[in-house]
């Protein structure tokens, strides 16, 4: 193509994404748009066409991004090229959302006509506003009996401050309002700007690993043009590659000659390692590089850590390979080898949040058939020692001696919780219990309240979200952002079996709740660890101080069975002999800890 054709093509491109809270109908709307523009035939339409991971469809959430090129003939007779970039709505994947929004000029904001605005809708709208996107409100699910579009329209204006007078009333399920949405995309979302002849600048907004082609980078070209055979350079890492092919998704991959300004597509360059195509990085030409990269790139830091160990130790290398493969598609996943006396060899893994952690564990079991055991999730603590050194501790068993510690700081998050006002009490009680600091309370309308709390991240990683959902009958929505570190009275609790520490059962706990927590765990372990031939004390200790204890009773053989009637001294002799034997056994015996015992420490239902 020459310059004129490229510019003409650029003016007909519209790049947009869809933002919505979970379950407000984003994937269904995407399906309808694909159907309307003829991207998928009737035969190929399956629910949630863009959610290609089996797990995504099963959980009904979008984890990875997808980008599709659609062709739409508008009412003005022009043929437009629409690029729909799908975004995940879950709080763990905020960075993925911000990158996919950076690749767009506009966003469709989907709000459920019955539910109204929820916490994650807000979080994502603010990201869109930060990226200066044109936002088109769509009020979805108007076919529901409980729909109240006028109230929601008012809410969009009051809470977000968007003009919702032209908001499209739609029902993606039934197919109402889809034409209007497409027309609004064409008329209201601006065409991309940028010069097709300038030095190349392309934003990587996702990457995935293909066993045959290496890494496939999903890119949005902001300036310049890229073709097969050119040498490219990644601006964050400085590595250079040669482009093998470029193409677009219609949702299936289709090779094209070039990608130019405004295009969204993919490129392969026999890149072996996904960490070379960092999401948010800028691709430029190696021989004619751009002066500076596109803004907004940052390295993702994991927030939650846990140990993953194969149940069958022989599969250690399989686990490493599986994690490496998952890391190819998931730059946020980090792992390094670690060993534990109790569990053998495994990996310490870092995740963005809890959902991310669960999904990785589930994919290891599902896609790679590796049975794993996970230790309790923990966060990164900053430990200041009396000699002035500062440590970052992400594994409870690395916590130094209490005598050496001057203070410990833990990460805090600012949590925004939206909840119907009938449930404000239980939610505030939950936050109090989790050591929350009350920030602010605002009424959105007569029915809904936004609460702001500062909470320790460590209190959220266990079961906060589950309890929040169950205490509000599923109505609360929750979003959090990291605000920094604060000093806390934290101690490390060790669990001793038969007088020996079991490193994998250690955890860090707030001093005030240490006693209760220790008691519950000790009782739980007593029931889970099988009885031995000798009695086994189970103890919880902080430093050298034992704070809770329970005993697993010994299994005993009835040594008196042979004595009929016999003399009491004869019986006593046999019992004494048995006792001696048990004592000897106890000195040499070791205790096997079953899988469930580790799980018990994590899944403390009655945690507090």
Swiss-Prot record:
It is found in: Cell membrane. Its main location: membrane. It catalyses: GTP + H2O = GDP + phosphate + H(+). GTP binds at residues 23-28, 140-143. GO terms for biological process: positive regulation of translation. It is an enzyme of class 3 (hydrolase). One of its GO terms (molecular function) is GTPase activity. HAMAP family: LepA. This is Elongation factor 4. It comes from Anoxybacillus flavithermus (strain DSM 21510 / WK1).
